[in-house]
Amino acid sequence: MEVLIKNLSEADETPYDLLLLADPSREIVDDCISRGSCYKAYNIKSGIETVIGVFVLLKTRPETIEIINIAIREEYQGRGLGKWLVHQAIERAKTEKVKTIEIGTGNSSVMQLALYQKCGFRIVGVDQDFFVRHYQEEIYENGIQCRDMIRLRLDI
């Protein structure tokens, strides 16, 4: 499979179906896109481009950038593309001349926690009740209520 990364332009359709896999709040997703840079991953097959993944980078401090949304279309999951997409986000972040990349995920996001640590991120903190404070609806994954945000960091 050949995959290409492109920056989302104003003319492009926003891939809400993917962005909402990682964050169920359209309002929060819109805020993230307006403040950050959104990148789409395309599967290029027979001249047809299919969006299979997405990530959003946001510079939060002069030397820090955060991956604030990242997702792979469900039918493409389990093929190593999540790890590949995290590495693509890291490479894009490096072009911003930052020293630190951050990412956060829910306490119930077991697979994502494993993935980010395999990509070199280290747990640096827990924002207790983050999802309770910022989301009206309760979120459950893997039979666990998502309450706390686990914060991870990668020094580059």
Regions found by a protein language model. Name each.
Residues 124-148:
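Short, flexible, glycine-rich and Lys/Arg-enriched loop motifs at helix boundaries
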Residues 73-75, 79, 108:
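Active-site acidic-Proline motif in GNAT/NAT acetyltransferases
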Residues 78-91, 118:
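Conserved acetyl-CoA-binding loop-helix of GNAT-fold acetyltransferases
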Residues 117-125:
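Conserved acetyl-CoA-binding loop of GNAT-fold acetyltransferases
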Residues 3-75, 86-87, 155:
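Acetyl-CoA-dependent GNAT
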Residues 93-105:
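Conserved GNAT acetyl-CoA-binding A-motif
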Residues 36-38, 146-151:
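Short hydrophobic/aromatic beta-strand or adjacent loop that forms the aromatic wall/cage
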